[in-house]
A protein has these predicted regions:
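Hinge/beta->alpha junction and helix N-cap segments in small-molecule ligand-binding domains
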Residues: 25-38, 56-65, 118-128, 144-188, ...
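Short, well-structured alpha-helical segments in soluble
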Residues: 65-77, 184-194
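Short acidic/polar active-site loop segments enriched in Thr and Asp
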Residues: 17, 79, 139-140, 196-198
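Amphipathic helical "hinge" segments at domain boundaries
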Residues: 2-68
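Flexible loop/hinge segments that line or gate small-molecule binding clefts
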Residues: 84-128, 206, 232-244
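Glycine-rich phosphate/diphosphate-binding loops that line cofactor/substrate pockets in enzymes
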Residues: 14-16, 130-141
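Flexible loop/turn connectors
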Residues: 171, 193-293
Length: 293
């Protein structure tokens, strides 16, 4: 893991077989979140065959992310960049193009420049999650999201609201940051509300596991008094008691698809412009019908 690239006269004169990826997050969040480690493993499974590896930088904010890209361009350290957590009005693709670095988007991308993208179908996944909870009888539903600037967060929020609207329900939405701290804090706040949610959807498994711990601490029965639904289906889901229901996304395969798109891009071959990975509902022990139904 790196936060800086070498510069100056000792920098390599040409790319050295690295594919860059920058995470704008605290190192604590990165250290506990399984998603990107599984994603990188999938990408490297494809890239390693071609003597390429992933160079990961963890930075504090968007300005630091741009400075990292600029250093990588100056030192010719990377062949291409995988752009993650696509944002509204995202200027990173244009910035990378201006610096001569090819890129592949991990998330929906309809902007300029036109680039290959690999994304999860967040709308279909949330519609399935919401439909399952509504069919069980839940009518007070909360959603603990990732950062609100991310397009996939916005897509999930809109999809949940649209699914609940025919029932006259307005879900409670609280923004988190994918960390266990956020999962604990927000779950504590939600379980103190009146009326209390009977179901909580989390945008990743780390926050869901943290929420389950809070429910146990407060003596709130899962799923008897509150149902908890995670997202991604990391190994964490099967290690809890009860095991977590979740929206299962094949993150490893998503990484493989991105790795393939990167190879096509740097080799000058046409890349698939929009590859889609679909999550599916996995029901385990943390969800059930609300009490009294």
């Amino acid at each position: 893991m790196s936060s800086d690239a070498p510069t100056g006269p000792s920098a390599p004169a040409r790319p050295h077989g690295a594919i860059g990826m920058v995470r704008t997050a605290s190192r604590r969040v990165v250290s506990v979140e399984p998603f990107f480690m599984e994603f990188i493993a999938g990408a490297e499974e494809v890239l390693a065959v071609h003597d390429l590896s992933v160079l990961l930088a963890v930075v504090a904010d968007e300005d630091a992310e741009r400075r990292t890209y600029a250093r990588w361009a100056e030192s010719r350290l990377v062949d291409a960049v995988m752009v993650v957590n696509v944002r509204e009005d995202d200027d990173r693709p244009a910035f990378l193009a201006d610096h001569g670095i090819p890129s592949v988007m991990v998330g929906r991308w309809d902007g300029e420049p036109s680039l290959p993208s690999v994304r999860a179908d967040d709308v279909a996944a949330m519609v399935e999650a919401a439909g399952y909870l509504l069919e069980l009888g839940h009518r007070t539903i909360a959603h603990v999201t990732g950062p609100g600037a991310y397009l996939h967060t916005q897509a999930r929020v809109r999809a949940l609201a649209a699914a609940c609207a025919p029932y006259g329900i307005e879900p409670v939405t609280v923004e988190g940051d994918y960390s266990d701290d956020a999962g604990e804090r927000i779950t504590r706040e939600l379980l103190a509300r009146s009326p209390r949610p009977t179901a909580i959807v989390y945008d990743n498994d780390v926050m869901a596991v943290a929420g389950l711990h809070v429910a146990h601490e407060l003596g709130v029965a899962v799923p008897g008094e509150v149902s908890l639904l995670g997202w991604d289906d990391s190994r964490l889901c099967r290690l809890t008691q009860p095991p977590l229901s979740t929206m299962s996304l094949d993150v490893h395969e998503m990484g493989r698809l991105v790795g393939a798109a990167v190879l096509e891009t740097i080799e000058g071959r046409p890349a698939v412009q929009d590859s889609v990975v679909t999550a599916r509902l996995i029901v385990r022990g943390s969800t059930g019908a609300p009490a009294g139904t």
